[in-house]
Design a protein with these regions (language model features):
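Glycine-/small-residue-enriched transmembrane alpha-helix faces in small-molecule transporters
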Residues: 1-43, 85, 89, 93, ...
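C-terminal-most transmembrane helix of multi-pass membrane proteins
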Residues: 2, 46, 61-62, 217-219, ...
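Loop-to-transmembrane-helix transition segments
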Residues: 10-18, 66-93, 138, 156-164, ...
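Helix-helix packing/entry segments at the starts of transmembrane helices
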Residues: 19, 44, 106-112, 175-196, ...
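Specific transmembrane alpha-helical segments of multi-pass solute transporters/efflux pumps
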Residues: 25, 54, 60-110, 143-145, ...
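Transmembrane alpha-helical segments that form core, pore/gating elements
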Residues: 39, 53, 117-118, 123, ...
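C-terminal transmembrane-helix exit sites in multi-pass transporters
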Residues: 52-57, 113-134, 257-281
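Hydrophobic transmembrane alpha-helices of multi-pass small-molecule transport proteins
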Residues: 53, 128-148, 168, 199, ...
């Protein structure tokens, strides 16, 4: 019992660290915009992340030796390319959006993908639980408070990040479609490579990248690439093993809260030049969005009132 409890505690802390790394990555993404075009940042960051995951794959397969699972390369490459397309769309929209909105707002809007995933199940002829629609309604109210201006307009950055959440939901559903038949690390490496190559092409066409830009923003690039993509992904794999999926999802949801706090701290200490302070109305919106995200992840049996177990 103690060993199981210790393992659960350890894995929970690992996922909390992962959520912290990913939440703080929004700060590095925002900082990177001071030095280079969004395509440049996204391209270099993704290639760094792909390299980090490749190292993890090589080490883990070397340790496994003859016990390493045989790969269906054709299927893994197909899944990686398809997931890479949606990842490219999602991460590009997010990176452009962060340029025009605050770190905290970007963090909370991005987490809406957690609600979109079960909602979009309707297109796959899956039954959507009533609680999902309730969460969607709450999220809409939260989004209104968080993003709507006095002139009843949404900011360009908020719209881009909202579309990014939709793209992330589709990307996650694509991964889920192949999950049982692929190696998650291999597919992740391929999809980051696809994203990196496509964004680097976009940077060459639109961003006019220079070595000086990359050198000045190297700290932000390394954090977003090595820690957020490489280390964060590896920690997620380790932390989720043997942990209750609901607990894991709830811990990972803290990414949005951490993004808001880290963005505010980064502004206060002068690391970010754009004001990251949220108004009371926006904070209320954040709370409602977060509550909706939590609600949609709770076990279905929690909502079966009046039913006795057989």
């Amino acid at each position: 019992m103690e060993n199981t409890r210790a393992k659960t505690t350890r894995n929970s802390l690992i996922l909390l660290l992962t959520a912290t790394i990913w939440g703080m990555a929004f700060v590095s993404q925002s900082k990177g915009m001071d030095y280079m075009h969004p395509f440049t940042f996204n391209g270099v960051r993704s290639l760094i992340g792909a390299a980090g995951i490749l190292v993890y794959i090589l080490i883990s397969r070397k340790i496994a030796g003859d016990k390493a699972a045989k790969l269906d390369w054709k299927l893994n490459v197909k899944a990686g390319l398809l997931c890479g397309i949606f990842l490219t769309i999602a991460s590009t929209l997010q990176q452009f959006g962060i340029k025009y909105t605050s770190v905290g707002k970007a963090g909370f809007i991005t987490t809406l993908y957690i609600i979109f995933v079960p909602m979009f199940g309707i297109f796959l002829k899956k039954k959507v639980a009533p609680v999902v629609w309730a969460a969607a309604g709450m999220a809409a109210v939260g989004m209104y408070l968080l993003c709507m201006t006095e002139s009843l307009r949404l900011g360009a950055g908020d719209i881009m990040v909202f579309l990014c959440a939709i793209a992330f939901a589709i990307q996650i559903m694509t991964v889920d479609h192949y999950a049982a038949r692929i190696d998650g690390a291999v597919v992740s490496c391929i999809q980051f490579t696809v994203c990196g190559v496509v964004c680097c092409i976009g940077a060459l066409i639109l961003g006019q990248p220079t070595f000086g830009q990359i050198q000045e923003g190297l700290g932000a690039l390394l954090y977003a690439g090595v820690l957020s993509c490489g280390v964060g992904y590896t920690l997620q794999i380790v932390g989720q093993k043997g942990l209750n999926p609901t607990v894991a999802a709830l811990i990972m949801s803290l990414e949005s809260v951490i993004a808001t706090i880290s963005g505010w701290i980064a502004y206060k200490i002068g690391f970010l030049s754009t004001d990251q302070t949220l108004t009371p109305r926006q904070i209320a919106g954040c709370i409602i969005v977060f509550a909706a995200v939590i609600l949609v992840q709770l076990p279905p049996e929690w909502f079966r009132f009046g039913k006795k177990n057989a």
